[in-house]
């Protein structure tokens, strides 16, 4: 996975933190925002009863139910839930760390800024497009990830309850990173 010119070493990691600390603060500050925005979102939901589920359902219909019924498999349930809980975060943030570690400031600037702007643009949708969990709204739909294990159920309830609508960061972040790498990779390294 590393470019041919790259060498992995402890000194490289130390140098990476020394040279790119501002990039890391920009991207990882999102975790601080998430706690603040989650608190604000819960206050808004409790006081305004915002529910835009009918709008999302008007666009999607029962498509997610058809996908669930067509692809339902116990093995996929476990793999995809665990990938979502850990793999998605690792894949997203390693794509940010990758150009930083290999000292490509041009790409590091663009990837960190694209991730930053995706989060900024998602805030109004996050706060004002609250939706119900799909399994609680669509008749016959199961909340597979919620019900896989008690630990994962607790994680979803506390950290990512799926109550915020479009545009999804789960699509927005990987797409923005891919688009950034595709558009700004001038030397063909990435």
Language-model-derived ranges and their functions:
Residues 39-54, 101-188:
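Membrane-interface loops
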Residues 9, 29, 64, 94-95, ...:
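Generic serine detector
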């Amino acid at each position: 996975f590393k470019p041919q010119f790259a060498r992995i070493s402890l000194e490289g990691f130390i140098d990476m933190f020394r040279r790119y600390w501002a990039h890391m603060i920009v991207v990882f500050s999102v975790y601080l925002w998430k706690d603040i925005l989650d608190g604000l979102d819960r206050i808004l939901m409790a006081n305004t009863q915002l529910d835009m589920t009918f709008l999302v359902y008007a666009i999607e219909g029962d498509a997610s139910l058809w996908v669930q019924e067509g692809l339902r498999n116990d093995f996929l349930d476990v793999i995809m839930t665990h990938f979502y809980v850990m793999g998605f975060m690792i894949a997203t943030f390693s794509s940010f760390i990758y150009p930083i570690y290999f000292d490509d400031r041009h790409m590091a600037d663009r990837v960190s800024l694209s991730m930053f702007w995706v989060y900024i643009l998602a805030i109004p949708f996050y706060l004002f497009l609250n939706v119900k969990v799909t399994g609680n709204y669509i008749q016959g739909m199961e909340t597979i990830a919620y019900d896989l294990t008690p630990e994962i159920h607790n994680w979803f309830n506390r950290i990512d309850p799926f109550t915020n609508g479009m545009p999804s960061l789960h699509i927005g972040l990987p797409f923005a990173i891919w688009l950034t790498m595709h558009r700004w990779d001038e030397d063909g390294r990435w």
